[in-house]
Amino acid sequence: MAVEHNMQSSTIVDVLEKILDKGVVIAGDITVGIADVELLTIKIRLIVASVDKAKEIGMDWWENDPYLSSKGANNKALEEENKMLHERLKTLEEKIETKR
């Protein structure tokens, strides 16, 4: 009589799919010091997830980054317009003050 073993094997694709679906957070601190004097501290925070999972947890910085998205370039135009409007408002306020 043969004994059957139920062995599960995962391929790299299966592992990556699970990681991207659920997300993985890696955090660590590296400190270099001599004689109780801290010389260097490196704080590492890494998240590995799919784009959908990242958006789900509120990480969508790449959507508004002008170097990564066309939406981000629009923010630059809005900033310029806002600056121009502030300058116009300041000029108008100064004109009102001088007429008083």
Swiss-Prot record:
Keyword terms of this UniProt record: Gas vesicle
Record-level Gene Ontology MF annotations: structural molecule activity
Record localization: Gas vesicle
UniProt-listed InterPro entries: Gas-vesicle_GvpA-like, GvpA, GvpA-like_CS
Biotech / industrial applications: The minimal pNL29 gvp locus overexpressed in E.coli can be filled with Xe and used as a contrast agent for ultrasound and magnetic resonance imaging. Engineered gas vesicles (GV) can be used for noninvasive imaging in E.coli and mice. Heterologous GVs with 2 copies of gvpA plus gvpC from D.flosaquae and the gvpR-gvpU operon from this bacterium make GVs suitable for imaging of bacteria deep in mouse tissues (e.g. the gastrointestinal tract), or when expressed in tumor-homing bacteria, can be detected in tumors.
Cellular component terms per the entry's GO annotation: gas vesicle; vesicle membrane
Name of one Pfam family that matches: Gas_vesicle
Family affiliation: Belongs to the gas vesicle GvpA family.
Purpose: A minor component of the gas vesicle, might be involved in nucleating gas vesicle formation. This protein could be important for the shape determination of the gas vesicle. Gas vesicles (GV) are hollow, gas filled proteinaceous nanostructures. During planktonic growth they allow positioning of the organism at a favorable depth for light or nutrient acquisition. When a minimal gvp locus (gvpA2-gvpR-gvpN-gvpF-gvpG-gvpL-gvpS-gvpK-gvpJ-gvpT-gvpU, called pNL29) is expressed in E.coli gas vesicles are made.
Protein name: Gas vesicle protein J
Species name: Priestia megaterium
